[in-house]
A protein has these predicted regions:
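Conserved single-residue anchors adjacent to enzymatic active/cofactor-binding motifs
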Residues: 1-184
Length: 184
């Protein structure tokens, strides 16, 4: 695990920061998610690869948004400092494991993964949906699920977007915007 990744995870795992990120990036700054409504959940899951070996995958952060004791959404955050060309496939694995983990519950809630891209040299250039990574015969296209990568380019946020942050994440976002603008 990279040191910078640990620092990002520790910061974003704070409920006030996590709620602020969700509120600004998904709800345009509206206070939909309160920090006391977020509950950590497991970030580890396993899968058996085609080689027959069992592998573990680890999300960066995963939290349930609960209101009145009821699960509303499971949010996941993935931090990226470099463009990951197979990100939609990775997200499909994370989200599939999250849905599978809910199968024994009374209700299944949506899983939303947010990719926070911290690159400052270039914008995200990789595919943002699964079908862009794979060749699907036309006659099968309607049967293939198309996982989407919700990529947020932090270094390219506007001043208006950054102004909507109310937590210390505003400092982080400003840092990456300034780093991109002032390469020196």
């Amino acid at each position: 695990m990279k040191e910078k990744d640990i620092t990002q995870k520790v910061l974003e795992d704070n409920n006030d920061i996590f709620a602020d990120i969700v509120n600004v990036l998904l709800f345009d700054g509206e206070s939909e998610v309160e920090e006391n409504e977020l509950v950590n959940t497991t970030v580890h899951s396993q899968y058996k690869a085609e080689d027959g070996k069992v592998h573990e995958q680890e999300r960066d952060i995963a939290k349930y948004w609960k209101r009145g004791g009821t699960d509303i959404v499971l949010y996941g955050i993935e931090n990226q400092t470099k463009v990951e060309k197979r990100m939609p496939a990775r997200i499909s694995g994370y989200e599939g494991a999250s849905y599978r983990g809910q199968c024994d519950k009374k209700t299944i809630v949506p899983v939303i993964t947010m990719v926070l891209y911290y690159g400052t040299d270039r914008k995200w250039t990789a595919p943002k949906n699964l079908k862009s990574l794979i060749k699907v015969p036309d006659n099968l296209d309607k049967y293939v699920n198309d996982t989407k990568a919700n990529v947020f380019e932090i270094a390219w946020l506007t001043d208006e977007q950054i102004a909507k942050f109310t937590s210390d994440y505003k400092i982080v976002a400003n840092f990456f915007v300034n780093k991109r603008k002032n390469k020196d």
